[in-house]
């Protein structure tokens, strides 16, 4: 069944998918579009999710970087505003690309999936730059928490996908295909039956980054309160 769905491009039905099409449809915002740098309210916050890949194989994963914006006027809302999605990006090219994103959006957190070789990115960037790198080490339990957090955000209608121009719609259609492929197996394992899940994982990482930032702010507030007392 998984083979048929993947190669015939047949997504899971809405009863099976973690991200039903009706939920994704509600997230599409025709007034929102992909932007190339931070714009609008300077008090808006930005968060980056980065799922790196290194391989010259044509069937290899994509490197994906997703930028989410948290509007200062509505901090419960998140808006997807920028995407980098490419194959065959070598180590140095990815380092340069994430530095460009940092310069354009000044994110509060860059959440990097850091399993195996991917940890080298964090090591180099922490040594040579002041980028706000946070690493996500993926175990089965943490990956499920990562995805379920994104599911809840969609279900609460607190995440907006850009649908305002052709470029945005093309990118979001690819994201939608990946999200529809996520479900729960008969063995109780939460996973994707798709060939690629990099876009969806990068989005989930960016969302995770927003929660890490909030936890850090709370910790700082608690610390200041303790000092005052």
Regions found by a protein language model. Name each.
Residues 1-137, 144, 148, 152, ...:
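RNase H-like, metal-dependent nuclease domains and their acidic two-metal-ion catalytic environment used
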């Amino acid at each position: 069944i998984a083979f048929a769905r993947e190669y015939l491009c047949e997504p899971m039905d809405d009863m099976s998918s973690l991200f039903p099409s009706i939920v994704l449809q509600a997230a599409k915002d025709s007034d929102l579009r992909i932007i190339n740098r931070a714009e609008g309210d300077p008090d808006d916050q930005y968060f980056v999710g980065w799922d790196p890949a290194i391989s010259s194989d044509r069937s290899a994963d994509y490197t994906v970087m997703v930028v989410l914006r948290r509007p200062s006027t509505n901090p419960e809302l998140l808006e997807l505003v920028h995407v980098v999605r490419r194959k065959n990006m070598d180590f140095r090219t990815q380092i340069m690309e994430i530095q460009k994103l940092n310069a354009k959006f000044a994110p509060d957190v860059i959440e990097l999936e850091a399993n195996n070789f991917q940890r080298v990115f964090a090591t180099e960037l922490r040594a040579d730059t002041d980028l706000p790198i946070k690493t996500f080490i993926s175990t089965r339990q943490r990956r499920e928490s990562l995805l379920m957090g994104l599911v809840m955000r969609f279900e609460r209608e607190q995440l907006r996908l850009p649908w305002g121009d052709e470029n945005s719609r093309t990118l979001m259609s690819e994201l939608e295909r990946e999200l529809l492929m996520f479900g729960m197996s008969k063995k109780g394992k939460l996973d994707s039956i798709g060939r690629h899940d990099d876009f969806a994982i990068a989005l989930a990482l960016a969302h995770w980054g927003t929660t890490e930032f909030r936890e850090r702010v709370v910790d700082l507030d608690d610390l200041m309160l303790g000092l005052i007392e």
